[in-house]
Regions:
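Short intrinsically disordered terminal tails
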Residues: 1, 94-100
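Glycine-rich short-loop/terminal segments
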Residues: 1-15
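Amphipathic alpha-helical packing elements
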Residues: 11-69
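Short, compact, well-ordered microdomains
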Residues: 58-96
Length: 100
């Protein structure tokens, strides 16, 4: 099980997957040039959604397709410091009609 974590520090935002820095995956799709964000709907939160989904699914097209709904239902509602498990992400994918 992969654990994704985000926190706000004095040095900025930190997002990890099992303790390793999560890449923005701009090579797949660039929604923003400002990196990750969360707690609201927008381009930087969608970049985070894309990065998490691609890390979990290893499927560029599905990650792009699901990034907006995942951002709206999950990423926009995260607290300043948060944790998501791969099981929670899998549940989102299973429950999303666009995932097929």
């Amino acid at each position: 099980m992969t654990i994704y974590e985000g926190r706000r520090t004095i040095d900025g935002l930190v997002v990890t997957a099992d303790g390793k820095r999560l890449d923005e995956h701009y090579e797949i799709k660039r929604f923003t040039r400002f990196g990750f964000e969360w707690t609201y709907e927008g381009e930087s939160p969608q970049q985070l959604a894309l990065a998490i989904l691609f890390d979990r699914l290893a499927d560029k097209e599905r990650a792009i397709q699901l990034s907006e709904p995942f951002m709206k239902t999950d990423i926009a509602n995260l607290d300043n410091d948060w944790k998501l498990t791969s099981e929670e992400i899998d549940a989102f994918v299973r429950g999303n009609p666009q995932a097929e």
